[in-house]
């Protein structure tokens, strides 16, 4: 079972369609985005992927073939707290990283 996870930075949230997860916390209380899973603080990518995967019918403990898509223009906004876990999951074969302009 595979899953595409689309991630967007908060600065672009107001001008684009809803995605699976936003990086940042300024829109946490906005009901406009209530259908989106939030991660409010310094987040654990594994937990976020597992929760999204579980929503698609997979198990929280065992997920694979997950494609993480980011906006190319947002890459500079993401610090090591997001890029390092993505790279680690790539090494373990669970995540395929894909730059995207979806």
Where are the language model's segments positioned?
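Acidic (Asp/Glu-rich) sequence patches and key acidic residues
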Residues: 1-102
